[in-house]
Amino acid sequence: VEKSKVSEKMGKLPLVIYSHGGSSTNIDNTALLQEIAAQGYMVMAIDYNFSLEAYGLTMEDATTLTVEAQKKFINQLVERTVPNQVDDIIYGLKEIQSTSFPLAKHIDFENIAYLGHSLGGTTSINASNRATPAKAVINMDGPIDPNTITKIKSPILYLSSYSPDLPDKILEGKGLPDANLYREVKKYELGNVTQLFDTRQDDAFWLRFKHAGHVDFTDVPFMIPMMTTDGYDKQQGHRLRTEVIIDFLNAYLKEGSTFEKIEDHSLAWIK
């Protein structure tokens, strides 16, 4: 950071705060974050040093493959981890606003967006209520905390993976050993997403990447090709995801831009 250089001609830059998913790190979306930074944003990616044990959870909780067990695990994960991660965001913001932080003078702290994947998406939405108010929030395939549904006021973009209503054969071809288990758990998650969008009339967008799996919203498929979901074009998917996200950020954090829905055969706008 000490050696980073920002052109004075740029003025103060909008800030995007990235939150990674559980059991991941803050480098899991480096390609996307570099693209965002290149468009004139300051980016802060927080590493939460996540572990199940730190929150009183176990690997058995995460891997008990029944619908009720997975619902319980999702709820416990959100209830126990997200408040702590939002505290980390609040602390991080305080630190970088300090005059001793080399880049503080280049950041527009009134112009902030929260972006996250999976549990980090949940964290991002909750941060928009508890931390510095957000001009925009982006959740990439993460759960929605039911306690925040009526509280979210910021413009929101939700990106979701392939539909749980696909036939068993297709779901199994995507590496799911139990298509029905996935279907029921995913529908449970999306129930809260649906409730959120039912309460919002303006500045709320829900986009499905029809062939993408959960991990495809990160850099992992590029680092470990075998992790790419069957039927998903990761090159095209990354390009489209980056374009949609940057267009959304530009519309709400920069003057003179409007958000237009990108059309492609691999995308489905739910709202």
Provide a role label for each language-model segment.
Residues 50, 56-109:
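Alpha/beta-hydrolase active-site loop
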Residues 24, 201-204, 209-271:
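Alpha/beta-hydrolase-fold serine-hydrolase catalytic core, especially in secreted/extracellular enzymes
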Residues 11-21, 34, 157:
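Short beta-strand element of the alpha/beta-hydrolase
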Residues 135-213:
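The feature captures the conserved acid-bearing segment of alpha/beta-hydrolase catalytic domains
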Residues 92-152:
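Primarily recognizes the serine-hydrolase "nucleophile elbow" in alpha/beta-hydrolase
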Residues 27-69, 210:
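Active-site machinery of serine-nucleophile hydrolases
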